[in-house]
Amino acid sequence: MISVKKTMVLGFFIVQITQYLVLILVGLLKYYTKMSSHHFVKEGQEPALIVANGQSCSHELLTQIMEWCPYVVALDGAYTRLCELQVFPDLVVGDMDSLRVPSTKRKTQFIQIDNQENTDLEKAIDYLVEKGYKDINVVWATGKRLDHTLNNVVMLAKYPSIKIVIYDNYSKMFVIPKSFSKVYKKGDLISLVPITYCKEITTENLKHPLKKEELQLGKRSGTSNEVSSTGVVKITYNSGLLAII
């Protein structure tokens, strides 16, 4: 009889411990999911959104990102296209050379910046940086003109202290810090793009691991690697600017 009671008590404690472990795991999952969605954006921060004038992303993706970004800036060439989607930005930035203003009662601020040494995207980023933004999401920055796409990617090197994420329908790209970790699923594809010459790159939980290796545009890149198992992927490097897609 005593052994039966001991067994029941032991079973009760096992059930309680299991429940606590489940709660802990759920909490961790929510935490990492939040990190995965916002890419370095700390709790309480609100990133801005820039809509460039490249190929449109899906309306679903656009509206989802807008939920994270209460302040929306459009480049002048994208303004009319946004209005056709019934999306009205808070601000339009550019040299206004390609601006067509549709009839609307929505209040939108227009700022003309004629500096021809910077692209309209750089003008928008510079404006947000001056306003104190440290986290910026960008859509419609790829596709259409190849020169614009390449410039928008290389442009990340100009803002090493700003957390900029470039989205399209298929992927997202951002510069990672010298020590980076994030939860991925087994089989997820990961590409490492050296915006500048990167040294001492070491990875964990990738099918093709790097161990204190170098990546450089035109010589060697780290495209189409694969996550080995569901869990945390770790990447470290000691110099340069390394982006992940």
Roles of regions detected by a PLM:
Residues 176-245:
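Long, charged alpha-helical interface segments
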Residues 168-178:
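Short, flexible loop segments at boundaries between secondary-structure elements
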Residues 39-44, 64-67, 85, 103, ...:
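Solvent-exposed alpha-helices and their adjacent loops that cap or buttress functional pockets
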Residues 35-103:
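N-terminal beta-strand-loop-alpha-helix module at the start
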Residues 16, 30-34:
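Short, positively charged and aromatic/hydrophobic N-terminal segments
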